[in-house]
A protein has these predicted regions:
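N-terminal glycine-rich FAD/FM-binding segment characteristic of electron-transfer flavoproteins
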Residues: 1-183
Length: 183
């Protein structure tokens, strides 16, 4: 079993963006994937019908954050520590690129940005394989990530958006009292 956390993003109407559905597709391609979707703030209707096991809400991003995402990084680090997933997936967006890299650094995990393919079975072989552009996009290279969790950002459009529906359990991850590390 490969446990995966997909970090969701919202559009201007508050609904799940297409790249989140693409990340769910990528996660579901992993063998025996157990997928959780994490979203800041309350879960919108589009999240509560995703074909995943659970949707976890964390604190909303404060308007004073100004694109730094310290709170989201701290909250996700606490969730990753509690859940011990094999893979954490983000969209390669401003949010995903910043928080993914910060999360990897904070927890001492491997970071694979801008991936166009993901494979492997973290529970059996202990590795996740990713394919990503190198040399300014002139070539693709395959990498194996042997540490867990692997923090991955996925290139938008590299996967078809998942259109299946489900009825995931929706739960809240309480981070009140969480000690936040200074910048």
């Amino acid at each position: 079993m490969t446990t995966v956390i997909v970090v969701a993003e919202r559009d201007e109407k508050g609904e799940i963006v297409q790249s989140t559905r693409q990340a769910v597709t990528a996660a579901s391609n992993l063998p025996d994937a157990q997928i959780s979707v994490v979203i800041t703030g309350d879960a919108p209707g589009s999240a509560t019908s995703l074909p995943v096991g659970r949707v976890v809400t964390i604190a909303p991003i404060e308007s004073t954050d100004n694109g730094i995402y310290d709170q989201a990084t701290a909250d996700l680090a606490a969730l990753v520590s509690a859940d011990s997933p094999d893979v954490v997936m983000f969209s390669k967006s401003d949010f995903g690129s910043v928080v993914g890299a910060r999360l990897a650094f904070r927890i001492g995990a491997a970071f694979a940005p801008d991936c166009v393919e993901i494979s492997g079975d973290a529970s059996a072989a202990g590795t996740i394989g990713v394919t990503r552009p190198v040399y300014g996009g002139s070539a693709l290279a395959e990498f194996e990530i042997a540490s867990s969790p692997a923090i991955v950002t996925l290139r938008a459009g590299a996967f078809e958006p998942n259109t299946d529906t489900g009825a995931p359990v929706v739960e809240s991850f309480d981070t009140d009292g969480l000690e936040r590390k200074p910048r």
